[in-house]
């Protein structure tokens, strides 16, 4: 759970790239709508696959005749990636999936008719894998009605701690510790809570 435009989609792309290059697995990416899934595949995923040398040769371009790949389904050695919209979950059915990635959880459909909750359906696809990975990201919408807020409350709520480069104090990053000279935000830097360096 985090604010808008803070790298959540890039996190998902990095997970996809890692698994294509180093730990091939069946991957499912759930976007709020089919249209958003198509846009994500064309605008973000395809660019990453094209521009990353370690991935470029593993996933054939969907335009090549023998690739078997489409905008919404791509095959690579040892795995595949399927991109779906939460508003059309039929393509999730009957596929065992080890890596489930849900983008913008709070904007996903709550129900897809007789299929039920599409996000719950996606999560169930990973039930047979002991080493499954389920990642849900979203900017929260309505307080106390947000699915990502609820998921966060049910989680371990772990935070990322980093050491200060000067004194070694372990701390979480907080916006109040970011400072810059007046009218020079490009010179912003982080001040340690302990030693202020």
Regions found by a protein language model. Name each.
Residues 1-197:
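Phosphate/NTP-binding elements of NTP-utilizing enzymes
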């Amino acid at each position: 759970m985090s604010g808008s435009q803070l790298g959540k989609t890039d996190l998902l792309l990095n997970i996809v790239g890692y698994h294509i290059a180093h730990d091939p697995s069946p991957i499912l990416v759930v976007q709020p709508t089919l249209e958003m899934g198509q846009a994500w595949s064309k605008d973000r995923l395809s660019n990453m696959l094209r521009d990353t040398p370690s991935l470029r040769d593993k996933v054939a371009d969907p335009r090549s005749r023998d690739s078997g790949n489409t905008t919404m389904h791509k095959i690579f050695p040892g795995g595949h990636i399927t991109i779906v919209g939460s508003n059309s979950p039929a393509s999730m059915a009957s596929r065992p999936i080890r890596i489930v990635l849900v983008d913008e959880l709070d904007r996903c459909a709550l129900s897809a008719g007789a299929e039920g909750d599409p996000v719950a359906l996606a999560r169930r696809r990973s039930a047979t894998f002991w080493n499954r990975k389920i990642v849900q990201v979203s900017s929260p919408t309505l307080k106390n009605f947000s699915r990502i807020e609820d998921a966060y409350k049910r989680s371990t709520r772990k935070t990322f701690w980093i050491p200060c480069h000067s004194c070694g104090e372990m701390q979480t990053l907080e916006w109040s510790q970011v400072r810059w000279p007046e009218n020079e935000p490009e010179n912003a830097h982080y001040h340690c809570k302990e030693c202020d360096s």
